[in-house]
Amino acid sequence: MFQAAGAAQATPSHEAKGSSGSSTVQRSKSFSLRAQVKETCAACQKTVYPMERLVADKLIFHNSCFCCKHCHTKLSLGSYAAMHGEFYCRPHFQQLFKSKGNYDEGFGRKQHKELWAHKEVDSGTKTA
């Protein structure tokens, strides 16, 4: 019956016939009702809401859950060090790993140089 003018024409509209046979114009709402993805904290596995969300090394945390693995001190984005998915305050990171000079040894893993030594021994025995 009537037509929208100007920028309103870009808005999608649907025609519906009333019981009297006359057509009416209904505009869809400009916002969508998309389902929001629930993000979970990497430390406590509970839902993280936008106001308490913190992202470090592509992992999502609550502000209160982002703490040192060794002393449980609350960390900030400028005061942490990460190793193999674990987060530490800088003093404990240095205490636990830097003094040894080998990060893998601090985690109980084989040293990188040992992995190379095994490959050389294996390749030497196969050629003989």
From Swiss-Prot:
Pfam family name, one: LIM
CC per GO annotation: cytosol; nucleoplasm
CDD domains documented for this protein: LIM_Eplin_like_1
Residues annotated with N-acetylmethionine modification: M1
Disordered: annotated span: 1-25
Positions of Zn(2+) 2 binding: C68, C71, C89, H92
Subcellular location field: Cytoplasm; Nucleus
Alphabetically ordered keywords of this record: Acetylation, Cytoplasm, LIM domain, Metal-binding, Nucleus, Zinc
GO MF annotation list: metal ion binding
Positions with a binding annotation for Zn(2+) 1: C41, C44, H62, C65
InterPro entries named in the record: LIM_LIMD2, Znf_LIM
Ranges of residues in domain LIM zinc-binding: 39-99
PANTHER family reported for this sequence: OS06G0237300 PROTEIN
Record text on subunit structure and interactions: Interacts with ILK.
Described purpose of this protein according to its UniProt entry: Acts as an activator of the protein-kinase ILK, thereby regulating cell motility.
Protein name in UniProt: LIM domain-containing protein 2
